[in-house]
Regions:
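Juxtamembrane "anchor/assembly" segments of surface/extracellular structural proteins
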Residues: 1-50, 88-90, 235
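Catalytic phosphate/metal-binding cores of nucleic-acid and nucleotide-processing enzymes, i.e., regions
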Residues: 21-24, 29, 173-175, 189-191, ...
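Amphipathic, non-transmembrane alpha-helical segments in extracytoplasmic/periplasmic proteins
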Residues: 18, 30, 38-39, 85, ...
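Short, surface-exposed beta-strand/loop "edge" segments at domain boundaries and coil↔beta transitions
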Residues: 10-14, 45-50, 65-68, 90-94, ...
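Envelope-exposed proteins and targeting segments
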Residues: 35, 67, 79-81, 168-170, ...
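A generic structural motif
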Residues: 36-41, 79-87, 171-174
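Acidic, small/polar-enriched beta strand-loop surface segments
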Residues: 181-235
Length: 235
């Protein structure tokens, strides 16, 4: 069963706003990389498609159990609606670490300190079974970059200590090794009808940390529309 939930939902043990009956639903997870859902939904006569909205959360079974994915893009055609959603983990893209530095610490101590440095609190938990002692710093970046990096040496928890990330809704674990399937596919019957919107909020920013050419940081600036979103989108 695939369900859809309000933007602010943090528990997914009910049907939320209701169920969806997509023509297809594909979940793809890359090791220490992208974790996304693509869903195609018909314009069903029961109006289930009307529950689809930017920021709402789709919950579906995966090889790792029931997982939540937040909608960031909707593309309608005459036949159906294509929906793109990221695992709820990627809510962390919209948070921000201004400056975090620690001396010698264990991976768990570093994760705890990094979470305390977020621009605003989140429901996420961070656990690891990695060992070792090291210094670590992260500044002017989002938590996803601090955790996974961008491929440069020692720019993230993963590149510093190794390990593989396991994303279980709001529970994030970095382990020595995790088993995983590369993709998951669901197909349902189709019943096509009408037409609607085209939205994409993947590049929206509602809070800015200005940094001058000399590296000096100014006062944060909030958009007048910041309250239209479920949490600040920081850059």
């Amino acid at each position: 069963m695939i369900t859809i939930h309000e933007k602010t939902a943090q528990a997914f043990d009910t049907i939320g706003l209701g169920t969806l009956v997509p023509g297809s639903c594909i979940v793809t997870e890359e090791l220490n990389g992208a974790y996304e859902l693509e869903l195609k939904h018909p314009y069903d006569e029961g109006g289930k498609w009307k529950r689809i909205g930017i920021g709402n959360i789709i919950c579906t079974q995966t090889p790792n159990g029931k997982q939540a994915f937040r909608i960031y893009k909707i593309q309608p055609t005459l036949d159906n609606i294509t929906v793109n959603a990221r695992h709820i983990f990627y809510d962390l893209l919209d948070n921000y670490i201004d400056s975090f530095t620690t001396g010698n610490g264990t991976p768990q101590q570093i994760l705890n300190g990094m979470k305390a440095a977020f621009n605003y609190t989140t429901p996420f938990t961070f656990q690891t079974n990695l060992t070792g002692i090291s210094s670590f710093s992260a500044s002017s970046c989002n938590p996803v970059l601090a955790l996974l990096g961008n491929g440069e040496e020692n720019d993230s928890i993963i590149s510093k200590f190794g390990g593989e990330i396991k994303r279980d809704n709001f529970n994030i674990a970095i382990k020595n090794s995790v088993g995983m399937d590369r993709g998951f596919y669901i197909r349902y019957s189709k019943n096509l009808k009408g037409l609607t919107i085209d939205e994409d909020v993947s590049n929206v920013i509602t809070r800015v940390f200005p940094i001058g050419k000399d590296g000096l940081k100014g006062t944060t600036v909030d958009s007048s529309r910041i309250n239209e979103y479920h949490f600040p989108k920081v850059s």
